[in-house]
């Protein structure tokens, strides 16, 4: 499971990539 977290426009965007 790949966990990516990046901040954009002052908001926190968390995306999960299933492998």
UniProtKB/Swiss-Prot annotation:
User: Which residues are annotated with the PTM Sulfotyrosine?
Assistant: 3
One GO biological-process annotation of the entry reads:
adaptive immune response
Q: Does the keyword Repressor apply?
A: no
Write out the annotated subcellular location: Secreted
Q: How is it modified after translation?
A: Conversion of fibrinogen to fibrin is triggered by thrombin, which cleaves fibrinopeptides A and B from alpha and beta chains, and thus exposes the N-terminal polymerization sites responsible for the formation of the soft clot.
Q: Kindly list the GO CC terms recorded for this protein.
A: extracellular region
Tell me if Coiled coil is a UniProt keyword of this record: yes
Domain comment in the entry:
A long coiled coil structure formed by 3 polypeptide chains connects the central nodule to the C-terminal domains (distal nodules). The long C-terminal ends of the alpha chains fold back, contributing a fourth strand to the coiled coil structure.
Its function? Cleaved by the protease thrombin to yield monomers which, together with fibrinogen alpha (FGA) and fibrinogen gamma (FGG), polymerize to form an insoluble fibrin matrix. Fibrin has a major function in hemostasis as one of the primary components of blood clots. In addition, functions during the early stages of wound repair to stabilize the lesion and guide cell migration during re-epithelialization. Was originally thought to be essential for platelet aggregation, based on in vitro studies using anticoagulated blood.
Q: How does it assemble?
A: Heterohexamer; disulfide linked. Contains 2 sets of 3 non-identical chains (alpha, beta and gamma). The 2 heterotrimers are in head to head conformation with the N-termini in a small central domain.
Q: What is this protein called?
A: Fibrinogen beta chain
In which organism is this protein found?
Equus asinus
């Amino acid at each position: 499971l790949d966990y990516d977290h990046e901040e954009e426009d002052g908001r926190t965007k968390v995306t999960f990539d299933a492998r």
